[in-house]
Amino acid sequence: MTDKKVTRLRRARKARLKMHELEAVRLCVFRSSQHIYAQVISADGSKVLASASTLDKELRDGATGNIDAATKVGKLVAERAKAAGVSQVAFDRSGFKYHGRVKALADAAREGGLEF
């Protein structure tokens, strides 16, 4: 693995350990060059309560690797999380910088009713 990826994974591991100690439901984000994925994971980490990505049928037809797509994913995951009875989450950015697509997804999820 490249040094950049190793350091990102190390940052992610430290953040997830802290969230595990707090026993918080977490909104986990992963981004690739073409898509973005979001999952709401239970406090013990054993169950995915809600998920959304640019691979979903509703979002697949449009552009998938930009800020607009990340905003749509954020709104969709917030809607699905609220339907599952989750309103408060810890934001797990998976070691990515809080900037660009990751920030757009987080802002849209907040607008959709999730509290961080």
UniProtKB/Swiss-Prot annotation:
Concerning InterPro entries, the annotation shows: Ribosomal_uL18_bac-type (IPR004389), Ribosomal_uL18_bac/euk (IPR005484)
- Its domain of life? Bacteria
One of the entry's Gene Ontology molecular-function terms is: 5S rRNA binding
UniProt GO cellular component terms: cytosolic large ribosomal subunit
Q: Which GO terms describe its biological process?
A: translation
User: Transmembrane residues, as ranges?
Assistant: none
Keyword list (alphabetical) reads: Ribonucleoprotein, Ribosomal protein, RNA-binding, rRNA-binding
What Gene3D superfamilies does this protein map onto?
3.30.420.100
Query: In which family does this protein belong, per the annotation?
Result: Belongs to the universal ribosomal protein uL18 family.
Q: How the protein assembles, per its UniProt entry?
A: Part of the 50S ribosomal subunit; part of the 5S rRNA/L5/L18/L25 subcomplex. Contacts the 5S and 23S rRNAs.
Query: Briefly, what is this protein's role?
Result: This is one of the proteins that bind and probably mediate the attachment of the 5S RNA into the large ribosomal subunit, where it forms part of the central protuberance.
Q: What is the name listed in the Swiss-Prot or TrEMBL entry for this protein?
A: Large ribosomal subunit protein uL18
Which organism is this protein's natural source? Pseudomonas entomophila (strain L48)
Q: Quick one: which gene encodes this?
A: rplR
